[in-house]
Design a protein with these regions (language model features):
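Sequence-level preference for short, compositionally simple segments enriched
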Residues: 1-161
């Protein structure tokens, strides 16, 4: 998804792939998209720079899968400080109960910035989510309604307001 400092906005899109099919260091908002997993693997592999607060934001998206796909993680950190958040997303039964993976490195659990709010669907229960990922409060989730908040740290972003 580009290079660090890149800002992207995907709306009403269909995106599918196999392993880490949404990856990189950019700040990207995915809104009202269908995100379809074609194999048992990982949806995201963010490599968000430490000094960028927001990486991938999925709002009001549907996470679906091909038939037979039943073990998919929301993400794993390509680099320390990976940032990915899912807000009000419908998660299919293919999403693993733990949600997130540390890419085989426990140190990533100290730096990865993973969060959810308002997830629905068979893959949404949070009781078995990894303890190092966050469940946002309504107030925290509301911050992501503001494009200035999402993109303010990217290159020359200036709000139109």
């Amino acid at each position: 998804t580009g290079v660090a400092g890149t800002r992207l906005y995907f709306v009403d899109c269909y995106i599918d792939g196999t392993t880490d099919f949404i990856f990189g260091p950019s700040t990207a908002l995915f809104e009202n998209c269908e995100i379809r997993s074609k194999t048992n693997s990982y949806v995201t592999a963010a490599s968000t720079p430490k000094d960028i607060a927001v990486g991938y934001v999925f709002k009001n998206c549907r996470l679906t899968a091909d038939p037979g796909v039943d073990k998919v993680y929301l993400g794993r950190p390509w680099r320390p400080y990976a940032a990915t958040v899912f807000i009000n997303c419908e998660m299919g039964k293919h999403i693993r109960p733990e949600g997130w993976h540390n890419w085989g490195n426990a140190e990533n659990e100290k730096t990865a910035r993973y969060a959810e709010y308002g997830s629905t669907g068979e893959g949404s229960p949070t009781a078995d989510r990894v303890k190092w990922a966050k469940q946002l409060t309504k107030k925290e989730a509301t911050l992501y309604d503001d494009l200035s908040y999402i993109y303010k740290m990217c290159s020359d972003w200036k709000s139109a307001k």
